[in-house]
């Protein structure tokens, strides 16, 4: 069937192989890996697992220091023997090559997004010839764009750009990214514009041009993904987020016969096994990293000794569930119910996190029917 419908495959033969492999892993996950109640909840629509084929293999989101990755040199140990090793970076040309390789390699080690920090300090050592640096940065972006993703929605690689630091380097990076965005129909590289210590107005003209031509930009006062997932402040280690599980609150509300107490009880009962399944997923992925399946992460985290992992469970359609299906008005009483649901979710996440010995984050996602 896949070969017959090969015209829908976006990345040629590799795309066909990836799709086939993910189909096999997805079936194995649902039939042999996940607890039966969690698998049944996914199949019934009570919860949703994104990227079933990659669930047990890759983390969803990575926050990592690109300066450390490149300055330490690219050494994949005994893995990927056909990939060049760069022991150290001393020139702008070596920096360009190393950056292109890092983008290509690290994008294969997450299913959704990698956020790279410290790009500006990395370039500050090579700021004598800014036009040449810009050309080399464009080369890095364009060369890395040939990397094949695991699906039609490839892993996004974003660079955090802090405003208020080394303005000349910031403008050089923005100019290079603008050129890359012009050349790429759907960019796989994005920018996180951190304006905590700077002013967006200083670079608003070029940023508006980038957005107009389809560049991927998000504004924040901290390190964040393109989807709004926040990294812990002042974290010195690599941070991994496992966040591709969502709970369908409107469906739970529909099955609760307009009883908000029963609704919250069902939410609690669903969250507990879901978080246990995510903890099991964390162990599986951590073991694969220790075995060197993800060589960049293995080297950077010293085989998971220097890393922080968070489980993220997303609640979808809270307002639609409370105001639309349970029948509460969007007033003071309705807001009390809303807060009760959030408190229930946070309480379960906190208790389960302590039990499992891992940080658990509760995220909120609006559904199309939310008011």
Show where each model-derived region lies:
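Conserved phosphate/anionic-ligand binding catalytic regions in large, soluble enzymes, centered on
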Residues: 305-321
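Well-ordered alpha-helical scaffold segments within catalytic/enzyme domains
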Residues: 320-328
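Conserved catalytic cores of very large enzyme subunits
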Residues: 3-307, 328-331, 335-371
């Amino acid at each position: 069937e896949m070969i017959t419908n090969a015209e829908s495959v976006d990345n040629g033969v590799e795309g066909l192989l990836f799709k086939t492999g993910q189909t096999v892993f997805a079936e194995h996950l649902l039939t042999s890996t996940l607890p039966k109640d969690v698998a049944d909840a996914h199949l019934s629509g009570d919860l949703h697992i994104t990227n079933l084929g990659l669930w047990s293999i890759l983390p969803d989101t990575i926050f990592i220091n690109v300066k450390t990755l490149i300055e330490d040199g690219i050494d994949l140990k005994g893995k990927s023997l056909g990939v060049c090793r760069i022991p150290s970076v001393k020139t702008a040309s070596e920096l360009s090559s190393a950056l292109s390789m890092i983008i290509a390699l690290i994008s294969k080690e997450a299913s959704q997004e990698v956020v790279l920090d410290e790009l500006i300090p990395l370039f500050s050592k090579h700021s004598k010839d800014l036009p040449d640096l810009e050309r080399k940065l464009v080369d890095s972006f364009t060369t890395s764009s040939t990397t094949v993703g695991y699906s039609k929605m490839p892993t996004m690689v974003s660079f955090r750009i802090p405003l208020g630091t080394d303005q000349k380097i910031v403008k050089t990076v923005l100019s290079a990214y603008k050129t890359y965005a012009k050349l790429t129909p759907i960019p796989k590289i994005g920018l996180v514009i951190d304006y905590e210590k700077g002013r967006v107005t200083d670079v608003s003209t070029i940023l508006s041009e980038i957005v107009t031509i389809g560049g991927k930009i998000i504004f924040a006062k901290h390190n964040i993904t393109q989807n709004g997932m926040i990294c812990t402040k002042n974290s010195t280690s690599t941070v991994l987020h496992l966040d591709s599980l969502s709970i369908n609150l409107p469906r739970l509300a529909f099955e609760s016969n307009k009883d908000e107490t029963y609704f919250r009880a069902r939410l609690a009962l669903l969250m507990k096994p879901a978080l246990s399944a995510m903890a099991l997923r964390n162990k599986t992925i951590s073991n694969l990293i220790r075995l060197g399946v993800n060589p960049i992460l293995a080297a950077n985290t010293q085989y998971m000794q220097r890393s922080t992992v968070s489980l993220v469970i997303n609640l979808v359609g809270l307002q639609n569930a409370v105001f639309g299906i349970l029948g509460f008005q969007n007033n003071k009483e309705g807001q009390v119910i809303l807060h009760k649901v959030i408190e229930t979710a946070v309480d379960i996440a906190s208790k389960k996190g302590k039990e499992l010995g891992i940080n658990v984050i509760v995220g909120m996602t609006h559904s199309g029917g939310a008011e």
